[in-house]
From Swiss-Prot:
This protein is associated with nerve growth. It is a major component of the motile 'growth cones' that form the tips of elongating axons. Plays a role in axonal and dendritic filopodia induction. Residues 226-238 have a biased composition (Acidic residues). It holds the Pfam family IQ. One of its GO terms (cellular component) is dendrite. One of its GO terms (biological process) is axon regeneration. The modification Phosphoserine is found at residues 41, 151, 153-154, 202-203. It comes from Homo sapiens. The gene is GAP43. Transmembrane segments: none annotated. This is Neuromodulin. Residues 139-154 have a biased composition (Polar residues). Residues 84-95, 119-130, 168-199 have a biased composition (Low complexity). It is a peripheral membrane protein. Phosphorylated. Phosphorylation of this protein by a protein kinase C is specifically correlated with certain forms of synaptic plasticity. Palmitoylated by ZDHHC3. Palmitoylation is regulated by ARF6 and is essential for plasma membrane association and axonal and dendritic filopodia induction. Deacylated by LYPLA2.
Amino acid sequence: MLCCMRRTKQVEKNDDDQKIEQDGIKPEDKAHKAATKIQASFRGHITRKKLKGEKKDDVQAAEAEANKKDEAPVADGVEKKGEGTTTAEAAPATGSKPDEPGKAGETPSEEKKGEGDAATEQAAPQAPASSEEKAGSAETESATKASTDNSPSSKAEDAPAKEEPKQADVPAAVTAAAATTPAAEDAAAKATAQPPTETGESSQAEENIEAVDETKPKESARQDEGKEEEPEADQEHA
C-alpha cells in the first residue's frame, strides 16, 4: 500500500509540475488570484447591497412622492366638492329668499283664518246665549200673558161686559158703573204694571178678587138706587 501511495504522489507531483511548466503560473499566484477574486466578489456583493438599499430608498422616496401627488388631487377634489356643496347651500339659501314673501303672504291668510276661527268661536257661545235669552223672554212673555189672563183686570172687564144688558135698561146704573169701573181698571193696571213674581202675583190676585167682590155689592146698591130714582124722575117729568 505504501508503495502505491508513494507512486501516486510522485505521479501527482509530476502532473502538477507539468501543469506549472505549461502555464508558467505558480500555485501561490493562483491562491493570490483566487483571494483577489473572492475579495472582489465580496466587494461587489457589498456594493450591490448598497445599491439595492439606495434603490430601495429611492423607490420609497418615489413612492412617497407618488402618494403625495395622488393625495394632492384627492384633496383638490375634496375642496372642489366642498365648494360645490357650499355653492349648492348658497343656492337654496338664495332660492329661499323669494319664498319668504310667499310665506309672508301666507301669514296674513293664516291670521285671517285665526280671526275667522275666533269669530266663529265667539259666535258659537253668543248663539246659545241669544237662544237662551230668547227662551227666557218667551217664558217671561208667557208668564206675563198668563198673569194678565188670570189678573182681576180681565175679570173686571168681563164683569162690565155682563152688566152691559142691565146698564142698557138702567141709564142711571150706567153712570154708577162708569164711576166704579175706572177705579177697578186703575187697580188692575197698577197690578199689571208691577213685575210679576210668584208670591206677588198670588197676593195681588187675592187683593184684586177681594176688591172686585167689594165693588159688586156697591154696584148692585147703586143700580137699585138708580131704579128707585127713575120713577121719581118720570113723575117729575109728568
